[in-house]
Amino acid sequence: MKRFAALSLAALMLLTVFASAASAVDVIEIRGPVYNGSDIDDIIDTYGDGTILTMDATDFAAFYYDIDDNVTTETLSIEDVPDTEGNVIGEGGLIYETTIQEVEYEYYNPDAGWDNYSLMGFFAEKYIPINPDKADKLSKLILDSDDKYTIRTGEMLDLGEGYAIEAKQVDVDGEKVWLEFTKDGEFVDDEIISVSTADDEANTWDVELDDIEDEDDVIVLKVHVNQVFQGAVDSIAQIEGLWLIDYANAMTIESDDEFGNLDDVSIDGDTLTITNEDTFTLTRDDEEEIGEGLYFATADTPSNVLRFYAMKEITDPGTYEIRGQVASGFGDQSWDASSFAGFYYDIDDNVSTETLTVSDLDGNVIPEGGLVYTTTIADVDFEYYNPDAGWDQYPVMGFFAEEYIPINPDKADKIAKLVLDSDDKYTIRTGEMLDLGEGYAIEAKQVDVDGEKVWLEFTKDGEFVDDEIISVSTADDEANTWDVELDDIEDEDDVVVLKVHVNQVFQGAVDSIAQIEGLWLIDYANAMTIESDDEFGNLDDVSIDGDTLKISNEDTFTLTRDSEEEIGEGMYFMIADTSSSDLRYYPYVEKTIGEEVSGEEETPEETPTGEVTETEGEEETPTEVTETPTEGEPAPEETETTESEGTTPGFGFMFGLVGLLAVVYLVRRNN
């Protein structure tokens, strides 16, 4: 029995530790243009032509776009059909359309058979039509790369989604390589590729398969081998040029298919059109699915105001590019949060703070002072909006597409990153810790149910910062809030760095529990002061005027064609590969979900590497993640707990495990 007790206690201790660990649910939102008016008719009149309003990849950053070829395939339109009024789109008035287009391979080499391929955006993902003239049979594009890879005899190159190629043999003398293509470890095809011939096309292996959605001779993989050579130890093949589709998960779209709220499917050759058979309501203060991960986000406004945007939610780990509206030509350009999805925006309060302008272009050169980034402090509502409890508004300032809080609400020179602004409910037991992100945490030192109090302790990287006993018995709702004020934050005193609102304390089945609703936190430990001589990438002329920060370029800034040029602090211009008579570019930032994935490093021809485990995914680029706290066990029925995703292991599981150990003990004793 002592042994069982020890095991049970160990299990309890282990699970208590795990219960305190945070588990962030990371989401990237890529939004389209912001539409603001009195009702849907007013918006169609203002932003459309009075009959129809259309967005495409040049202004909706989620849609597929090829800047070099200036290729878009997708549009989303709202048409003023009957019953389109107020906040309602009538039947057939919400129209998603996509058309097959030709784009160049990343490894562009027409002599080797690498010129163009057919592509179609499908709900903001890149798909390949199995038949290049018909839009009904699609397979997702996994890989289109011109990076160099080296692969040794017996080595495998992971292509993603379970696909791989292996170098079975590398014959340096014969200038050949034997490659094998597999899916989930199962053989698919193999080929001996010769690189000795003058015919560059012979260096390419096209894997063609039959019966892909009833289509034959479908190219599913293209591999171009540059050369084979003898390394210090191994025989090595160098690959430059990889293209792959996910043929194992190809699909055929039927006329009776449904995609979210889009359920009227029409296929006309190379064009796919899907509309709504039923009316579509833009419900205020809500997100309504359009289809396949596309949504409309609608602001919490009175009935005489309608404000919304289309957006794509991404939850898969990886790196993603969030771009602004595409600029074309040599005229002046400007972006704000309505035209650059990377900039900070609060749809409910219609608050944006950042602008980026380009003026007086000379060809592709921006003169001194012609590139200007400006941001101004604005007030927004707390997510937990409760003015009676001291939760009304706080000052915010976008800073290079990140959300920052001014230490002094009237001055833009001292800022700290916003870590958390949440109205979710969390339960926390005596001795339990709630991870707030970035090393910050709060712990319930004691929960006094009879006295209706909770003793909370605030820590940073495990070190004590402050503590407070919060009473929830008073009728004064503001007394339920703990404001942690610290001094000497960038030479400022009485700075509120954390706000916690405690709803109630109650007795659970075993533990005393406090319920928190309302959390707000800034990263004060990494606050910064912006000086007039600071430099931010190519922006180095800093001007601070009260609540406004302006940074411009002291030197000329060249929009070099076919390149990416840093603006500052992770913000870039992407410039198309065009002729000198044309100029096309957009600003972008990169966001990351999960652990940051390092980019591919090209292997110089003279020094090939043995690393071949890297895989190039589609449209993924580095990004920042805002961590959110983990919720504990749901409260009793009378208290609603939100955000079921990302919860910590519940105590029900813990006691279930202890019960299981008890059963094991009793069975063994009886035996």
From Swiss-Prot:
Region feature (Disordered): 594-650
One cellular component term from this protein's GO annotations in UniProt: plasma membrane
Listed Low complexity bias regions: 623-633
Pfam families found in the cross-reference section: PGF-CTERM, S-layer
Presence of keyword DNA-binding: no
Keywords: Cell membrane, Cell wall, Cell wall biogenesis/degradation, Glycoprotein, Membrane, S-layer, Secreted, Signal, Transmembrane, Transmembrane helix
UniProt-recorded name of the protein: Major S-layer protein
Taxon lineage: Archaea, Methanobacteriati, Methanobacteriota, Stenosarchaea group, Methanomicrobia
